[in-house]
Every structure is written in C-alpha cells, then in structure tokens.
Amino acid sequence: MPKSNVEKIKLHILKKLFDQRCWMHKLFNINNIQQGLPPHARDSRIIKKAVDDLIKNKWLLSKPTHYGLELSLNIDKKKEIEEYIEKNLF
C-alpha cells in the first residue's frame, strides 16, 4: 500500500483518470479530483503537490484553461501507470 498522503492521493488521481479512460485528449478538470476523497484528505496543497509530481514524471498531461487546469493520462506511459496502480492497489 502507498505510504504517505501524497502517494495515496497520486494513486487516487491515477485510478480515477484510469477508470474514466482519460487518455490524451479526453480531459478531466482538476477541481473534480477532490470528489471521492474523504474530507480529511481534501487538502488542496497535498493534491497540488501530487499533481505536480505526476506531471513531472510525465504520467499526467496538463492543459491550462480559463476555468482551471485540465488533466489527462499520458498514453506513452500507459504500461507504467497500469503497473503502478496494480502494485499499489492490491
């Protein structure tokens, strides 16, 4: 299982985007990531750090819009993302 809160949030983000099939040009608003998290885990600073780490690892692609940041999974890293989810989820 993931150890830190940031790792748990990363897993939540990847799993949510994976379940919604948000690869490449299918986008997901960053404001909707908090849905599905327990109230004590909805700290926007931790979520921002997790998103920044995933973008830095190139697992997430970001698109700035006038109403917020849109995210999608990078299809080039599909195998790595699937392995990470399987390893940490089960």
Give residue ranges: language-model regions.
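A generic structural signal for short
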Residues: P2, P38-H40
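Short amphipathic alpha-helical interaction segments
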Residues: H40-K56
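Short acidic, hydrophobic short linear motifs in intrinsically disordered regions
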Residues: W23-L37
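A short, conserved structural fragment
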Residues: I55-T65
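Short alpha-helical segments that sit at the start of domains
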Residues: M1-H25
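Minor-groove-contacting beta-hairpin "wing" of winged helix-turn-helix DNA-binding domains
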Residues: Y67-N74
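Short, amphipathic alpha-helical interaction segments positioned at domain boundaries
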Residues: D76-F90
